[in-house]
Amino acid sequence: MNEEKNETRWDRLLAVRTTGRDDTNADQYRYPYEPTPYSVLERLANSGLIRKENTLLDYGCGKGRVDFFMSYQTRCQSIGVEYNERIYEKAMNNKESAVASGRVLFALANAERYTVPETVDRIYFFNPFSLELLKKVIARILNSYYENRRTVKLFFYYPSDEYIAYLMTVEELSFSDEIDCRDLFDGNNVREKIVIFEIAV
């Protein structure tokens, strides 16, 4: 099935509207909203790394695609954090109609100031912000970990070289695995992957 049809099919099935890029309020620190392709999310869901007992935190959630899809497919709890009020309202509108809305929460907040709930043990990023903000967010995640030690997996889709270089220097993080997604798209782009890091107890 081609990507465009797959996008429409899943939005219809989940009873949400998440397609389309949005550059509103994007700047050098916070990047435009662009949803993760459903084909990539299917691969993540099929990995078995996110399950019913997990709580997923999605930074820069936009209209909530990751949250609705993963909650529907894996039955996990999901929290989406979005700083853009206009896009956050679209996520909340989707929540009213979405199939899996009962397991999804949204927070209107700046990621670098958001307190990570102690139940969160899976965290998703699709290049939502600059390296400068990522460092502050990782510090928040580590604070949450030290308050309640548990295994936390961090998923980075389409990561930049600077993201990976930085993550490799964080003592508490260890590289765990990667999910190759190059075959889903034309061009054999080496960034088409989900890189997984872990904070282990």
Residue ranges and their predicted role:
Residues M1-R51:
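S-adenosyl-L-methionine
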Residues E53-G62:
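Conserved class I S-adenosyl-L-methionine
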Residues G64-F68:
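Glycine-rich SAM-binding Motif I of class I
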Residues Q77-E82:
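Conserved SAM-binding motif I beta-strand of class I
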Residues S101-A109:
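Conserved SAM-binding strand-loop segment of SAM-dependent methyltransferases
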Residues R122-L133:
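A short SAM/SAH-binding and catalytic strip from SAM-dependent methyltransferases
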